[in-house]
Design a protein with these regions (language model features):
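A generic "binding-loop/recognition-motif" signal
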Residues: 48, 57-58, 97-98, 107
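Conserved metal-binding segment of the jelly-roll/cupin
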Residues: 85-104, 116
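Short, charged/polar surface micro-motifs in flexible loops or helix N-caps
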Residues: 32-35, 45-49, 66-70, 117-121
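Short histidine-centered beta-strand/loop micro-motifs
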Residues: 28-29, 51-56, 73, 82-84, ...
Length: 137
């Protein structure tokens, strides 16, 4: 656990590991008591990505910090809208909307994600390739 709830590094928390990469929740009820949202650092390995999914009852913000990829978000009619994304791009995923991310670049893609309200990301623990990655620091 981090020494301070206000300053959290991804290496200080248990991460969610998957075949495509990992999610290290650095803010949320179980990390530092945040009540209205949760978030953290997602790392997507080259050629990796997560399948189409949604977070029932929650909105999501995705900020691409490094790497390049392809992001899909369904519009109001359920039509997939896809865009090439890179560092600095912010993606808004409306409440309960289906979306997916694919790393199309040669290096890991790093994202900062925020879920509001907190909680839907915990359903990722039910995925077949889920595993816990212990803190490094």
């Amino acid at each position: 656990m981090p020494a301070s709830p206000y300053f959290v590094h991804p290496d200080q928390v248990t991460a969610f590991g998957f075949d495509w990469g990992q999610l290290a929740l650095t803010v949320g009820p179980e990390v530092n008591g945040a009540k209205r949202f949760s978030g953290g650092i997602v790392t997507v390995q080259p050629g990796g990505g997560h399948a189409r999914h949604n977070h029932p009852g929650a909105e999501e913000i995705i900020l691409v910090m490094s790497g390049t990829g392809q992001q899909m978000v369904e519009d109001d009619a359920g039509t997939p809208i896809t865009a090439e994304v890179g560092p600095g791009c912010t993606i808004y995923v409306p409440e309960s909307r289906v979306h997916s991310t694919l790393n199309t670049g040669p290096t890991p893609m790093t994202l900062f994600v925020v879920y509001s309200p907190a909680g839907p990301e915990l359903a990722l623990r039910d995925l077949p390739d889920f595993r816990l990655i212990p803190p490094k620091g």
